[in-house]
């Protein structure tokens, strides 16, 4: 046992190749390194290429500044996702995910084998994104402690975890899914089908659930049940029921919010604009921040209605519009003359440092797609949300924001949106009685987030317990291996 304890634990971390997953992985890596772990952080070549193109000064190693500022042992490497850099992963979504499903694991396997021959200390633990289907296979082969990192709310994990119940009760994967309230999932008091993740809202009559996305879902949420530990980017006090239901099944630790307000690690896939000068001198809480995240697409018709609605509202705004927000092959999507009409009242940028902008006192609300990182950051900064979910977990996240925590409002109940809806709801969010109620509620949720990460808070306590348990499991595995090696001579 003493020999095992003398070896520094070495964790390999592999986020899913999407910016919203990379960000919490980066911050967890830094935190684990500060607790004495050696970290090897693995990005895909494609993700690294986008980051290095956007941040020319950090083109080689995104953790170089973090290492020099904190003396952390974080090593950085990249691996192919099976496609050339110029392959359009956005336009060829299904083909890309076929590669992630079938090819990517072989590259990870080769990397671990190479590192085990070369690195000191050897890799002893894998922290992989829950959406990977091969984590258990890799960990079994290389005798690694298996940790699954869930970057979304516990409610979403809990629903995916119990897909078998949704199927057997006819709410998912049925020819004509039931439309009544779902009240039989452990830890979920009641949820309507419209609040399920978008992948679970479809029936077999509408969609082929044998496609690659569904094969990934079915395999990933079977594989997570084999993990030694699951860590979640959420807070125990915000989702006690879902977390308790999951914790009854296996070791699950709520360690969120996993982000940093002053990160030195570049994670953006696009060059960032500095909005500080534009915000300077604007009245407190007068600016609406609008962003629909790093992944989801919005139709050109919807972009046009949102643009006109923002102008009609009379509210000042910063609108983050990725170049591929409509599609990588649709460069022009704003209505003619929009930027001129907005004049000094509106700023349009392709990307920015979100935390830097929304923490500015001039910003008073967030018009969002309901990505989980954006929700956590918005609450941290005390901003109410105008919710326009687009896909996957965002519909379920909206339920938490609007129905459970009462810190946001819906943009619309149907998929079709109008400029009048946008204008009216922007004004509701930013001013008046509804706005005041939302801000009071946000402050309560914000206290839960900030209390959780204090030295005696639930997330910090859970993190320290997780670290201790991982160390113990690594030591046990190393001792078992050493025991097997020396047993013939006994």
From Swiss-Prot:
This is UDP-glycosyltransferase 86A1. Its EC number is 2.4.1.-. It comes from the Eukaryota. UDP-alpha-D-glucose binds at residues 294, 352-354, 369-377, 391-394. InterPro entries: UDP_glucos_trans, UDP_glycos_trans_CS. Keywords: Glycosyltransferase, Transferase. Belongs to the UDP-glycosyltransferase family. PROSITE patterns: UDPGT. Coiled coil: none annotated. Pfam families: UDPGT. PANTHER family: GLUCOSYL/GLUCURONOSYL TRANSFERASES (PTHR11926), UDP-GLYCOSYLTRANSFERASE 85A1-RELATED (PTHR11926:SF774). One of its GO terms (molecular function) is UDP-glucosyltransferase activity. The lineage of its organism: Eukaryota, Viridiplantae, Streptophyta, Embryophyta, Tracheophyta.
